[in-house]
């Protein structure tokens, strides 16, 4: 499903550049710091300054931004407003992306109430659960529908991104339903490995894995070692 442009076709990337996945993963981190700088009325930032804010080294910042065609000005740095626009455009944040959340337990409910989605162009258009007690509940103006209604909702309001926040044992079933409904991008919070067709983009967020990684570094710190990855 194609997203809706928020400000006309000129907001789309000029070309589909080949950008390394590691660089793509850092762009939202740069963007967050740039928003903070902009809110503080800072108009320019050096690669060193941006690197300090983001916890990376300056050479990596310069290399990452060069993939966007942004090289900054020697002795001045990067224009914060221009860089904000470049990264937002590259990440597709100048378009509206309709999203659906399946699973309205504690995590799903929190995601549905998160106001930060709208500020980045992610519009919640569907909320789904299998619990009869939740059906009909309004969350930020969006009604919770039964998961069986997913195909009908997707036909009426195409969904670009589906978020899975269900128990692990039903995650694959939910993923299959999203794919069957025409959803081509899925973010999986469920503690399970799921498979999707090659045409579908899948991202996995596993909080337990992140905690185990932190446990590894905490153990090293306690033993007097280095904490940095």
Model-assigned labels for residue ranges:
Residues 104:
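Glycine-rich Rossmann-fold phosphate-binding loop(s) that bind the pyrophosphate
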Residues 33-38, 140-229:
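Phosphate-bearing ligand-interacting subdomains
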Residues 1-14, 63, 85, 158-159, ...:
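Flexible, compositionally biased loop and terminal segments
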């Amino acid at each position: 499903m194609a997203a809706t442009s928020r400000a006309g076709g000129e907001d789309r990337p000029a070309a589909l550049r080949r950008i390394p996945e590691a660089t793509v993963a850092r762009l939202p981190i740069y963007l967050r710091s740039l928003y903070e700088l902009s809110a503080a009325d800072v108009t320019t930032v050096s690669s060193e300054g941006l690197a300090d804010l983001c916890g990376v080294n300056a050479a990596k910042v310069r290399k990452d931004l060069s993939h966007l065609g942004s090289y900054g000005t020697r002795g001045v740095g990067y224009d914060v407003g221009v860089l904000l626009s470049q990264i937002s455009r590259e990440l597709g944040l100048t378009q509206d992306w309709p999203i659906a959340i399946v699973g309205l337990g504690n995590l799903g409910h929190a995601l549905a109430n998160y106001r930060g989605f709208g500020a980045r162009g992610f519009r919640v258009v569907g909320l789904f659960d299998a619990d009869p007690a939740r059906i009909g509940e309004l969350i930020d103006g969006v009604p919770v529908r039964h998961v069986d209604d997913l195909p009908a909702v997707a036909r009426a309001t195409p969904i670009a991104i589906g978020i899975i926040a269900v128990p692990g044992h039903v995650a694959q079933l939910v993923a299959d339903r999203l794919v069957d409904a025409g959803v081509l991008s899925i973010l999986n919070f469920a503690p399970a490995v799921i498979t999707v067709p090659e045409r579908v983009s899948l991202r996995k967020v596993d909080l337990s894995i992140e905690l185990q990684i932190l446990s590894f570094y905490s153990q090293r710190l306690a033993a007097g070692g280095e904490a940095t990855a």
